[in-house]
A protein has these predicted regions:
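Structured catalytic-domain cores with a bias toward divalent-metal coordination
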Residues: 1-184
Length: 184
């Protein structure tokens, strides 16, 4: 999904569901799309609500069964946290990863939404030089890294972009008021 504002000077790339079964980011991105359309935000946006549809195949009735493809029992153990290392893989996953990286190329700001887990509090991963960009986002906990990690966010940080990874609520509990708080 793309949105282009005539006065925009920056482009934001927003994705959810890169780990497939981490479902929280998917409805959050959909809600954010509604906000963009309603408020005509002065940015260009590239939104990918479900950035890893193949990853949905590693669960049965909402429970993760591991990283094997349920239908073929072949290991799909791609570490999507280290996405830049996989972009040249001659596989469906490698092609998809390259597509995601290409979609994010024009972005000045890259936001990657994940699911924190049942007992974790929402938090943001940020490079130490980008912590200032996390202020005022409504998530008080920030984990900063300094070493190269090859994550989706780090790959874009290395290209000079603002890149943040959001670890949101549990995928089993997504409340609309939480989404509203995060979107405002």
């Amino acid at each position: 999904w793309r949105y282009n504002h005539p006065d925009a000077t920056q482009t934001v790339y927003l994705q959810g569901g890169i780990h497939g079964i981490e479902l929280t980011g998917i409805p959050v991105v959909h809600e954010f799309i509604k906000e963009i359309e309603e408020h005509q935000l002065a940015y260009n946006f590239i939104c990918v609500p479900l950035s890893n549809p193949m990853g949905l195949d590693s669960q049965i009735m909402g429970v993760q069964t591991g990283y094997n493809n349920i239908h073929t029992n072949q290991q799909n153990c791609w570490n999507w946290n280290r996405i830049s290392n996989l972009k040249d893989e001659p596989s469906q996953e490698g092609h998809w990863i390259k597509t995601l990286l290409d979609l994010a190329k024009p972005a000045d700001i890259v936001l990657d939404l994940h699911t924190a887990g049942v007992e974790a509090v929402p938090h943001i991963y940020s490079h130490v030089t980008e912590v200032k960009h996390t202020e005022g986002l409504g998530i008080p906990h920030v984990l900063a890294w300094s070493n190269r990690s090859y994550s989706f966010a780090d790959t874009h940080h290395q290209l000079g972009k603002i890149a943040l990874t959001f670890e949101l609520s549990s995928s089993r509990v997504v409340r609309s008021e939480w989404m509203e708080e995060s979107l405002i």
